[in-house]
Regions:
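Arginine/glycine-rich "motif VI" loop of SF2 helicases in the C-terminal RecA-like domain
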Residues: 53, 119-127, 153-154
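A cross-family phosphate/adenosyl-ligand binding-site feature
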Residues: 1-96, 134-176
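Active-site/ligand-binding-proximal alpha/beta "capping" segment
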Residues: 88-123, 130
Length: 177
């Protein structure tokens, strides 16, 4: 199975979250899976790739050429696909992946997560989705989503398409759904 991980590329996030990203990559590898990710060597993105690669997984990166120009691509990726736009990046990651895990991240991570969630709801794919949040960063987001559902602004069944987890093992188990 090829598992996509959406996560932060921010340079100043908590080092514990970077360590956690490494552990997720390691868990992906030890479970016999490969990693698909945004192709960067920095922050949580770099850590998840190192964790996967150092434990035997293939690492398949998808990165826009403009980021290669900034030299943040992972030169050790097993495969590195270069694309022109973020839309192409997201589409290729979706195509290459069999499941998706979102770690805490910023607006880029959220945008990727929501797009893949909407795609699942609209039946463009049937691949599993998990949020892996060991620090409670997405707690307010989850509350907001429940608030929307309470006002009937979310359709029945949408929330059930995402597994909300706090541990690597839980997120990896969700990939088998």
């Amino acid at each position: 199975m090829k598992i996509s991980v959406y996560c932060s590329s921010a340079p100043d996030i908590d080092p514990a979250l970077i360590d956690f990203a490494y552990e997720l990559g390691k868990g992906i590898a030890l479970a016999g899976h490969d990693l698909v990710w945004g192709g960067a060597k920095i922050s949580a993105m770099g850590a998840v790739a190192r964790g996967a690669r150092e434990n035997g997984a293939k690492t398949i990166g998808v990165i826009p050429r403009s980021l290669v120009d900034r030299e943040i691509q992972d030169p050790n990726a097993t495969e590195l696909h270069l694309v022109d736009t973020m839309r192409e990046r997201k589409a290729l990651i979706e195509e290459l992946s069999d499941g998706f895990i979102a770690l805490p991240g910023g607006i880029g991570t959220l945008e990727e997560f929501f797009e893949i969630w909407v795609g699942r709801y609209l039946l463009f794919h049937s691949k599993p989705i998990a949020v892996l949040d060991p620090i409670g960063a997405y707690g307010p987001l989850r509350e907001a989503l429940e608030h929307l559902a309470g006002h009937k602004l979310m359709k029945s069944g949408q929330n059930e398409l995402v597994s909300w987890t706090t541990q690597v093992e839980e997120a990896l188990s969700a990939m088998a759904r």
